[in-house]
Amino acid sequence: MSKQPRKQRKALYTAPLHKRHNSMSVHLSDDLKEEFNRRSFPVRKGDSVEIVRGDFRGTEGKVEGVDLKNYRVLVDGASSQKQDGSKLYQPIHPSNLVLTEIYLDDERRNQALNRKV
């Protein structure tokens, strides 16, 4: 693996979707860190997150979507209203989020979370 910044950027921009999913990991809150013995976990729709940086800092909300193409997360609390009344979500980078509650209805995700790291 190269150390060159241009090759690192190229790898990020040209990564396939199944590999982008792992880079969409969000840090766990302190109590979740203790419970699951891991620092971060890939985010998905249905998780609850807290925004720790940016204009929406301190806002908690459910994840409404994950944009793998642009490496962004859409959070329910970080939205504005358009003129016609519809919601416009502000895309947020996963590094600016902390996972507060994990959506565990998915069995494979449950196994991945409890797997030894």
Swiss-Prot record:
Keyword Oxidoreductase (UniProt): no
Lineage: superkingdom = Archaea
Has the keyword rRNA-binding been applied to this entry? yes
- Which GO molecular function annotation, any one, does this entry have? structural constituent of ribosome
Region (Disordered) residue spans = 1-28
- GO BP terms in the entry: translation
Q: Which CDD domains match?
A: KOW_RPL26
Extent of Basic residues compositional bias: 1-10
Q: Which Pfam families match?
A: KOW (PF00467), Ribosomal_L26 (PF16906)
- Check the record and name the SUPFAM superfamilies matching this protein: Translation proteins SH3-like domain
InterPro entries assigned to the protein according to its UniProt record, in alphabetical order: KOW, Rib_uL2_dom2, Ribosomal_uL24_CS, Ribosomal_uL24_euk/arc, Ribosomal_uL24_KOW, Translation_prot_SH3-like_sf
Question: Which UniProt keywords are listed?
Answer: Ribonucleoprotein, Ribosomal protein, RNA-binding, rRNA-binding
An example Gene Ontology CC term for this record: large ribosomal subunit
Family listed: Belongs to the universal ribosomal protein uL24 family.
Q: What does this protein do?
A: One of two assembly initiator proteins, it binds directly to the 5'-end of the 23S rRNA, where it nucleates assembly of the 50S subunit. Located at the polypeptide exit tunnel on the outside of the subunit.
What quaternary structure, including any partners, is listed in this protein's UniProt entry?
Part of the 50S ribosomal subunit.
UniProt xrefs under HAMAP family: Ribosomal_uL24_A
In its UniProt entry, what is this protein called? Large ribosomal subunit protein uL24
**What species is given as this protein's source?**
Methanosphaera stadtmanae (strain ATCC 43021 / DSM 3091 / JCM 11832 / MCB-3)
